[in-house]
Amino acid sequence: MNAIQQKCRPKHQVLVLKCYPRTTKGAVDVKPNSSELSYLLYYAASRKSKFQKVGSFLEKKTASDVWRLRIGNVQVTLQILEALIEKNPKDLPLFAPSVLKILDLVLKSNDITMVESSTPTFEAFCANHDASSLFADQAYLKQYESIVRQYASLASTRRSPGKTTPSKPVAMRWRNTGLEAIRSVASSDALASVQGTQYDILVPMILENLWTDNEEFLEILLHRAHLEEKVDTDKLLLRRRTSVATVRTAEGGNEPNPIALSGSAMDVDKLAEEDIGVLAITCLKQIFVGPNRSQIHAATVALLKFIEERVNQDENVVKKSARTGRDSGWAIKIFGLISRWAPVQERYVILMTTMDTLVRMPLSDESMRHHIVWMAMMGALLRSDVNLIGLSVMDVLLALMQHMKRLVQLPGDPSGASASDMLLPGQPDPRSPTTIAASTAAQATAAARKELLERIQQTIGDLATHVYYADQISDMISAIIQRLRPSKSNSPGNTSPQGEKIDGQVASPEDSTVESLFSLTVAKVAALKAIKTILLVANPRTKMAGNLGLARNKVSISVWEGTQWLLRDPEGLVRKAYADAVITWLDRETVKGDLKAVDESAPNPRASIRYTRDLGKMDVSPARRAASSASTRREPKPTRLHFLNLIHVAIYDNALQYVDYETDINLLHVLLAKLVDRLGINAVRYGLPMIFRLQEDIQEVDAPIGKVRVGCLVHGYLWALTEKFDFENTLVGRAIHNEIIRRRSKHFWIEGVHVPPPLLELIGTPGMVKPQPKMPLNQIESEALLPFDDRFALIDSICTGYQESFASPPTSPAASPGRSFTSPILGSQMSGLSPHTATDDEREVPSRFRDQMYVEWTRDLVIAMVQAGSKSASLNGSKTGTTGTSRYANARLGGNTGSPMASQQNLRPYSQPAGKDTLAPQNNPLAKLRKSSLRSNATPSPASSGPIRSGVTSVDQLKMVLSGQVAPAVVRAQTSHGNGAGGLGADDSTDSLVSYDMTVSEMSFNAGSVTYTPSHPVPRPPSRSRSHSRERRAASRSGAESPGGFDQLSRSNSFGKSNGNGRTIEDGRHDRHDDDGVPPVPPLPSGVSSPPLPPSRDGKSPSPRSPSTQAPVLPPVSLESSAIRPAKTRSLKSRGRHSRSGSIPSAPAPHAMRPATSAGHGVVGGDSAFDLDALLLGIDTKDMQGTLGNVTRPVY
């Protein structure tokens, strides 16, 4: 019967059965007959229809063999399938379902030997499997997923196949078999297909075999995996180089491990664990090395789910070092490994997937640990040397800000403050178990919130580790600041100027929600700390290797525009965090080039040159050039920034508002000192006028200790100036330091105000009352704090120090410039002779800066100018006058003149005027702005009633004066514009093209008029005296007066002010002038004399003038002396022996002055004739040597 049955079998069955050798039951490692197998393969390949029949027959035989535990026959069956797949890979879809069915039968046998024998067959199947076959048949797809799931479950460390628990060696064999199958799946193309994704099954099994509490074990696995990869590569190269005729008798790679031979059972198990771990590392790497974005995304999601499960099981996946504060742990290690394995262009997918998972997960106190772990993983990846090319930094930043918003939305205290209960009447005892448990839970929740908030701000800073485009850091800081700005509907009700009002931006509803949340103190502090972290990370002290070749733009000052209101926040933590962020920016982002004076109002000559050059290159017609090039090629006008101006306003407000808190004064001192140190003259131009105003406002502080604190802030700033501009050894510097030493010796000083300033971390929380220092309050009330009033000498020292700091050594001694300044200050374009080179002009402090330091500062004035100056106004005025300059004029002329600090000389060393309104209009650059017709009927004021406003105002009249056709007095009477000869009314004309103003330095170095005694007080007579310039003005005004002239004059000249010590001092600031660029007065014809003045409107004849009170004869005008350009103040150190102080009218004839009346407005008598000889004797002819004589190019 058996023979008949064999003859009746189909041929393919006969060929298959001949492949099985004769073995006993239970035999293992059985191989098929080679010759019969070869014929079977030829038969199946030649007849394609036989593949399905062979597969069906093998299914039936395998089911029978598995049932009877014929392990040898099962092994032969699996080898036959492997040979069929490898010999005919293109025909695999024909019998692939039979292969999966046979594998399913083997896996369900739960026999470790048969399952281990199936892994080569499954590997061959995965290697030659066509992923497109999964799209067509859903039954086949489910069959494939079932096989993958069964193989993956074998690698689990928590459960084993079978009903009984296997021994440890057998369990390791099961895990190894499962990992081998997973590696086969990971290397197949089907894994990358949409239908073949099994990451939620494969990745968790791999990670289970890698899970450990010892990070060193992972390092060992990585090292061994690297060595095995190297060995495999060497084997591959060796096989390629081996000859076909070479017979290899032994394999050197399968040598036994000496530890397994000589070690104990524990050592063998440890070695087996390492082998499994190496295989798991290889499987995980195989998944992430593929250049498939969806594959990396799905695998990352599976990794995050596995970590979430471990956290739910109270596993410690992230550790924080108590010594260094760095994060470590299994999760961070694995996260870093997969990021390095992934292709460079796909690495960012890992971070973005983690960010999306973090945002989608509900944020509550129960899930706080998950958020902390994921945030730690993201931060560790961002701060590592792994470059995430393609990462959208701004998307991650905005997502982190959104997450911070969700955190502060949680009920309770979002700051993570202490939740300990206090002993209050009527509440349970906190030592009871219930209260202790509740308090402990509240403290743990608060600590978790605080840790998450800190990690969010640290992760935001870690985004700056790698720079992917030039403006990345600036954009990050700007985005954070934008969300800190309150909307107009809920802006804080402080009095600080709001930058967002200037910007004119309208907030969207979404932004309003975020802004309302960021109005919380904790959110503001966290955002500001994040800005500080960004700056610290972007500017490391030691450069990272990954950032050496990357360049970025520095964070400009424009990002801080409109943020000064944060310094005015009522919460001290916010004020400190804001100051800390600004100081960090100054330390890390500013360079030495930022110390150079930058005048944003000056024209850019390079722009015009480049524009002309580019216009010449355009091959178009001239008409088209004129029509189109101006709009397309011209550079935009730079935006005017007001941050430095407004931050000093906020400092001024804080100094007066928080005078009761010593920490606030220390904070302001550190901020001011850092501004001076890092920005130099660019910050001093705004800070110095504010400091002098603050010094005057000391009198308004009620508490004596408050006066001491504000005084410390003022002199601390002056101390910083002496150190920065290196003039501590000058008279001005010694005066400042002597006063500081005196105050410190008398304990009129607070700790923390010194240079260099203390670290901000050492300063306490602003707004917190500290223990009062031991100060002699009785001495504070009795002894005055001597202010510093030598403002002009201080500014000159600052300018000199600035010039010396940028001075470069000459190339040779012969090329060094001389000190004989023979050309006029205004210069002559005809002569072409200029004593200064281009480098000298660059080292000079711009005249605009000098003017701003001379300005009498007021808070309301600055705010008005900023609001109006966003269009065209500036601190130096404009050609036509603007709203900002008009407001300044109104505020300046209507200011308070009764400041007790406004003293010209207050009987102490180094005394110079520093009062509110002691700066004369002719010394005040802003008071000389050109007025429009709208201001022609203004109330008479000192700015419009002086001799400057009543001088020659037209070119024709100037020519008449110079030619001798008419006397200056006649011209003055003709240019009074309806106000009589005296000219005390409002002047509706513009400024004169040439004004006769003396410089401050001329007055201070005029030996005939001013005596400068630095070490002893100036003795004063009992009666009030007046300076020569004041007598000259009074005399000129008394020549012809309107009925209201005396009243206006008495209002504009206030005398008899007290210096705080009961002594009467004068307000003599009006003898200062800032127009130092006027050439010497040319000689007039000898026959010219001053005719009598015409009668005034009221019919009264004016009193004759003395020669010293005549209107000054004006010099010829050059193009550079017009009112369009601001006057340039000459440095004190730039003068030679021959000064122009002798050319002022008061110098040649000091005896011509007459004492003033007791009221200060008496009529000065004198000769009616014009004394030309005395005038000509006072002209310094050496001042015009080296020019074209006394004639320069006129404006006409």
UniProtKB/Swiss-Prot annotation:
Residues 838-847, 1064-1076 have a biased composition (Basic and acidic residues). Residues 487-498, 819-837, 872-888, 898-909, 934-944, 1049-1062 have a biased composition (Polar residues). Residues 1079-1095 have a biased composition (Pro residues). Coiled coil: none annotated. Transmembrane segments: none annotated. GO terms for biological process: protein localization to plasma membrane. InterPro entries: EFR3 (IPR039786), EFR3_HEAT-like_rpt (IPR049150). Residues 486-508, 806-847, 872-951, 1008-1160 are annotated as: Disordered. One of its GO terms (cellular component) is plasma membrane. Residues 806-817, 1036-1045 have a biased composition (Low complexity). Residues 1127-1140 have a biased composition (Basic residues). PANTHER family: PROTEIN EFR3. Belongs to the EFR3 family. This is Protein EFR3. It comes from Pyricularia oryzae (strain 70-15 / ATCC MYA-4617 / FGSC 8958). The gene is EFR3.
